[in-house]
Structure formats: structure tokens, C-alpha cells
């Protein structure tokens, strides 16, 4: 899965345009970001250098202004510098399975931020074991998070979106309601 990094100044400049469009055209006051608070990129053009630290500060300033404007903000994975300005953090790491030498884990981070921000782990219907993910969510105080689409998932075959193989709402309706 490849993707391109955009100049930090371009990203920040376009957030206002995006927020204004969804607010004015659709009446939506909430905004969700996948990369703000998750990915830091610098700009190493000698004419307009932006370090990763400056990029982080630009993201924090933008998040502050969105919160002050009354927007609800959702971020993905939520690195610590954006958590104070996020109303909800999705895809937070609530498991330590990435490290093979660990037998048990204590959710220190979740204990520290519990009550400060709402958060969830990865989408339950996209996890390897949905029952285990529900138990881990309860264990860490995380909310339950699902990813749904209305159309049949067969439409996603041979596309860049096959990771959403288990997102058809009709298949999950009885389980989630």
C-alpha cells in the first residue's frame, strides 16, 4: 500500500477549506483526520524548510483552532500531541501483540488518558478475532468501533479497498444492534 506525503503547509492550508466546505455545504461541524496526529512529514525544500517538529506544531495549532471554533475532532491513532484536542481517537493500539517476548500487558496509556478522551481500538469487524477485540476493548476502557458500508463487499474485489471485506452492514446488523 503506497501513499504520498503532502507538504505540511499545503495540508494545513487546505484543512480550513475542507472544514468550511463540509460546514457550509452540508451543515457538518465535526471533522475526522486520518493523518493529522498520526503522520509527521517535513518539507526539505531549501526555500521553505519545515522540520517534523515544526510540522507537529502546525498540526497542534490547527487542532487548537478547530476546537476553539466548536468543531468536534476525531483522529486516528492519536499521537500524544493531538490527544488534548481530540474528542475521539480511533485505531488506538490496545494490544501489545507486536512484541513476541511479552506474555501479558498492562494498559498504562489507556489508564492515563481514560476519561480525558474517548478512544477505541481497531474496527471490531475487521479484526482477526472480534470476540477477543471486544474483550480487549472492555479491558482497556475503549469504545467499540465498527466500519460499515451499505453496498455489497463484492464490489470491492479487485480494487484498492479489499481490506474492507467484512464491512457490509447487513451481515453485522444483528450482532451490533
Give the ranges of each region predicted by the language model.
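Active-site-proximal substrate-binding groove within the catalytic cores of carbohydrate-active enzymes
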Residues: 2-29, 37-177
Amino acid at each position: 500500500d503506497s501513499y504520498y506525503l503532502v507538504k505540511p503547509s499545503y495540508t494545513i492550508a487546505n484543512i480550513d477549506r475542507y472544514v468550511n466546505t463540509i460546514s457550509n455545504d452540508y451543515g457538518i461541524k465535526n471533522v475526522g483526520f486520518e493523518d493529522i496526529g498520526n503522520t509527521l512529514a517535513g518539507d526539505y525544500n531549501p526555500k521553505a524548510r519545515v522540520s517534523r517538529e515544526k510540522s507537529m506544531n502546525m498540526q497542534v495549532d490547527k487542532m487548537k483552532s478547530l476546537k476553539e471554533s466548536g468543531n468536534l475532532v476525531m483522529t486516528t491513532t492519536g499521537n500524544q500531541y493531538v490527544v488534548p484536542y481530540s474528542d475521539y481517537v480511533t485505531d488506538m493500539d490496545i494490544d501489545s501483540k507486536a512484541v513476541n517476548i511479552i506474555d501479558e500487558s498492562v494498559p498504562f496509556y489507556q489508564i492515563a488518558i481514560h476519561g480525558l478522551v474517548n478512544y477505541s481500538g481497531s474496527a471490531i469487524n475487521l479484526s482477526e478475532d472480534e470476540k477477543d477485540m471486544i474483550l480487549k476493548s472492555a479491558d482497556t476502557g475503549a469504545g467499540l468501533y465498527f466500519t460499515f458500508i451499505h453496498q455489497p463487499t463484492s464490489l470491492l474485489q479487485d480494487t484498492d479497498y479489499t481490506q474492507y471485506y467484512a464491512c457490509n452492514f447487513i451481515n453485522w446488523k444483528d450482532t451490533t444492534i
